[in-house]
């Protein structure tokens, strides 16, 4: 575990780390808005059928000139069960008799209606345009709206596995830059998509890379920081998600047409992809993949940025080889995903991490649906949601400084489950308490996720860190799909879905204790480090590393 010694020589928390985390903060903040875009770009505004009396401005007549808009609407559009104008049907012929006696004139038959064969008219008070208004994704086509987000999440699921392995094989920096560029190109092209199918394809391509931008930011920040400070960078990047949520709410409030909003959050990614070329590749990854010369150059560059001029003389290839001799010997053996599956301890850790990620994602998505009761303004909801998660993630940062990872996660997960289960059996009249509990649940599950990210990265070896992060992302996406499916259980009991939402985090909180504790411990670099790891072996390795350093 000698890399932390090298990092101390180059600077474990200096100018380089601050600039790196600041860059990741900005990129993650902008990238996270792309995940939530459909909240606004695919919003369904109020709508009704297009009818000649109201919407054909070339038509004029005594009746249409004299009568009010409400009266013309009454004779053209039938009412639904809530006595509101139907959104998907219109009268074949104007029903003038409905204007008399409050619409109760004698009628032997119900007036004939038809679908909106001439299209729809949309309410533009909240959104001047969305993809729904562009391609008329309403009424019998409304199910197509969910296809966009489903394809985006499917892309995230596939991309997590694909780019995770590519990152472990070809490097964090190259994949990070590529993912930024692909997301920028795909979502910019989506604006100019001529058809809905083409738009979906581009959103799928954006989904392939979006999650990996944030995953690689976590990994690079972790691998360039000593263990006792790793939680700082990860927490700050997580907080950027919350800022991104609030930023998107503000931008969507100011920009009401979908294509301008899409373009506004896509253009910065082109600039960021160019700037990302100035990033330094993970020296930890370079050394553990037997690229000793490149790893030494990266360490020297970081030392120079951190103002450690004398470190350039110390950080020689011989010094790096001496400090990392054990890891270099292990790196001589080529590894693949098969080796990961054959390692019993690491395999068990990945299984536990995957279920915990699933257990965090299910209640998170379930609570999002319930939080809509906070208000009717989607813009206010987005900002409020971001503020809640920001506060909780900052709190998690402070708690991680003083509490073990397992206890930290477990307490948060138990609190999430308790909030949901109590909320499940409260009466609908206790609206204020229900909202408070739902808000507390969102905050605690966000805090649990913050600790999970730190713990997961500290448990997995450098040679497979991106791969295992990709596997965790797959289970996160599975949780996003499972949460709405659980809501179908409401046909058996209105409480059953919410009981399930509450049980998942409690189980996750219990499973956390099956994982090793990692607070203030060196990162594992190889599969062998994980397999042979015990408290005693770690102490021995740390003592060996100390002896190596004192010899120079």
From Swiss-Prot:
Recorded GO CC terms: plasma membrane
Regions crossing the membrane: 16-36, 144-164, 175-197, 201-220, 232-252, 255-275, 349-369, 371-391, 407-427, 435-455, 474-494, 496-516
Pfam families: MFS_1
Entries under InterPro entries matching the protein: MFS, MFS_dom, MFS_trans_sf
Lineage top rank: taxon: Eukaryota
Any one GO BP annotation for this protein: lipid transport
Subcellular location: Cell membrane
Gene Ontology molecular function, alphabetical: transmembrane transporter activity
Catalytic reaction list: estrone 3-sulfate(out) + glutarate(in) = estrone 3-sulfate(in) + glutarate(out); 17beta-estradiol 17-O-(beta-D-glucuronate)(out) + glutarate(in) = 17beta-estradiol 17-O-(beta-D-glucuronate)(in) + glutarate(out); taurocholate(out) + glutarate(in) = taurocholate(in) + glutarate(out); 5alpha-androstane-3alpha,17beta-diol 3-O-(beta-D-glucuronate)(out) + glutarate(in) = 5alpha-androstane-3alpha,17beta-diol 3-O-(beta-D-glucuronate)(in) + glutarate(out)
Gene3D superfamilies hit by this protein: MFS general substrate transporter like domains
Function: Renal transmembrane organic anion/dicarboxylate exchanger that participates in the reabsorption of conjugated steroids, as well as bile acids, driven by an outward gradient of dicarboxylates such as glutarate or succinate. Transports androstanediol glucuronide (5alpha-androstane-3alpha,17beta-diol 3-O-(beta-D-glucuronate)), estrone 3-sulfate, and estradiol-17-glucuronide (17beta-estradiol 17-O-(beta-D-glucuronate)), and taurocholate.
Family statement drawn from the similarity comment of this UniProt entry: Belongs to the major facilitator (TC 2.A.1) superfamily. Organic cation transporter (TC 2.A.1.19) family.
Protein name: Steroid transmembrane transporter SLC22A24
């Amino acid at each position: 575990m000698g890399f932390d010694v090298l990092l101390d020589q180059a600077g474990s928390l200096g100018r380089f780390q601050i600039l790196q985390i600041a860059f990741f903060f900005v990129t993650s903040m902008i990238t996270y808005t792309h995940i939530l875009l459909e909240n606004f770009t695919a919003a369904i505004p109020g709508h009704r059928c297009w009818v000649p009396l109201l919407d054909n401005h070339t038509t004029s007549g005594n009746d249409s000139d004299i009568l009010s808009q409400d009266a013309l609407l009454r004779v053209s559009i039938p009412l639904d069960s809530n006595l509101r104008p139907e959104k998907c049907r219109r009268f074949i012929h104007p029903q003038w008799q409905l204007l008399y006696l409050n619409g109760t004139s004698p009628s032997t038959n119900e007036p004939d209606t038809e679908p909106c064969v001439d299209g729809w008219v949309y309410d533009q008070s909240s959104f001047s345009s969305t993809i729904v208004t562009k391609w008329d994704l309403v009424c019998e086509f409304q199910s197509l709206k969910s296809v966009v987000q489903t394809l985006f999440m499917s892309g995230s699921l596939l991309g997590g596995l694909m780019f995770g392995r590519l990152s472990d094989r070809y490097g964090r920096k190259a994949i990070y830059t590529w993912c930024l560029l692909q997301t920028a190109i795909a979502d910019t092209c989506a604006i100019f998509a001529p058809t809905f199918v083409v738009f979906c394809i581009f959103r799928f391509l954006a989904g392939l890379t979006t999650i990996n931008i944030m995953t690689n930011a976590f990994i690079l920040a972790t691998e360039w920081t000593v263990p006792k400070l790793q939680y700082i960078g990860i927490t700050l990047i997580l907080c950027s998600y919350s800022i991104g949520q609030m930023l998107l709410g503000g931008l969507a409030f100011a920009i009401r047409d979908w294509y301008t909003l899409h373009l506004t959050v896509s253009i910065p990614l082109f600039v960021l992809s160019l700037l990302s070329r100035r990033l330094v590749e993970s020296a930890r990854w370079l050394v553990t993949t037997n690229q000793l010369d490149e790893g030494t150059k990266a360490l020297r560059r970081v030392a120079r940025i951190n103002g450690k001029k004398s470190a350039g003389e110390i950080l020689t290839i011989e010094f790096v080889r001496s400090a990392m001799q054990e890891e270099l010997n292990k790196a001589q053996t080529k590894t693949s995903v098969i080796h990961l599956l054959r390692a019993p301890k690491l395999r068990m850790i990945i299984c536990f991490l995957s279920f915990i990620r699933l257990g965090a994602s299910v209640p998170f998505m379930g609570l999002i649906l319930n939080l809509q009761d906070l208000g009717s303004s989607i813009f206010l909801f987005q900002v409020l949601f971001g503020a809640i998660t920001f506060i909780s993630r900052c709190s998690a940062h402070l708690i991680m400084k003083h509490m073990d990872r397992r206890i930290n996660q477990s307490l948060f997960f138990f609190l999430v489950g308790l909030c949901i289960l109590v909320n499940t059996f409260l009466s609908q009249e206790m609206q204020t308490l229900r909202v408070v509990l739902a808000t507390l649940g969102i905050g605690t599950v966000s805090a649990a996720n913050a600790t999970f990210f730190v713990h997961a990265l500290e448990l997995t070896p450098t040679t497979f860190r991106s791969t295992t992060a990709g596997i965790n992302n797959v289970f996160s996406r599975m949780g996003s799909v499972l949460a709405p499916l659980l809501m179908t259980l409401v046909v058996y009991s209105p409480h059953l879905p919410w009981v399930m939402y509450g049980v998942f985090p409690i189980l996750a909180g219990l499973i956390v204790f099956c994982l090793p504790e990692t607070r203030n411990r060196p990162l594992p670099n190889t599969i062998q480090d994980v397999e042979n790891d015990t408290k005693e072996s770690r102490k021995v390795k740390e003592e060996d590393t100390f002896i190596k350093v004192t010899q120079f």
